[in-house]
Amino acid sequence: GIPMESVERSEEILRDVRTTISELVVDVFYKVLADCAKEYDCQFSAECVAPTMVSDGLLHYQMVDLPMGEFWLNSPTHDKLNDMLDAVSGAHIYGKSIIQAEGFTEVRGTWDEHPGMLKALLDRNYALGINRLFYHVYVHNPWLDRKPGMTLDGIGLFFQRDQTWWNKGAKALSDYATRCQALLQYGHPVVDIAVF
C-alpha cells in the first residue's frame, strides 16, 4: 500500500488493526464458543485460525479446553508448521495437558501411503508435543461389495478397511499410537528453551 504520513506510522496503524482483529476473534468467536460449551458442560476444542487469517496463533488457546493443530501428509502447499507449534505452545502457555492433532490430512490423495510413512510423520509430531491424534480421515464405506468408499473427494488419509495394508499394518499403527499417547499424556512436558 501507500504509506500514510510515514512508513513507521503506517506500520503502527497496521499493527493496531491486526491486534484489534486478533482480539475480536478471541472475544466474539472463541470466548462465545467457550461460554456455550461451559453452559452445556462440554469441553471445547479448536484449531488455530492463523495463518489463514489475521490473528494471533496463540491468543485464542486460552479459551479452549483442548488445543488442536493440524499436520498434513504429502501436501506441502497446505501444511503450516506453525499450526502444530501454535497448538503445542498455546497448550504449554495456558496450562493445557492434552494437545490434539488432526493428523495426516492430504490434499491430493494417491493411495500410496503406508504405515511406515505414517509412523515417521506421527513420531515427528509426537516429538513436537502432541499427545492425542485424530485421523483425518477414516473413509466411509457402507458397502461391502464396492471400493474404495466415499473419499471426501481425495482429501484426507485413506485410512479404512479397503486399504491394501489394512489387515497387515493398520492395527499395529493404531496400537502404537495408542501406547504413545497414553505415555505422553501421563508425562509432563519439559521445555528447555522458549522462542518468541
Segments and roles (model prediction):
Residues 1-67, 72-196:
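Carbohydrate-binding surfaces of carbohydrate-active enzymes
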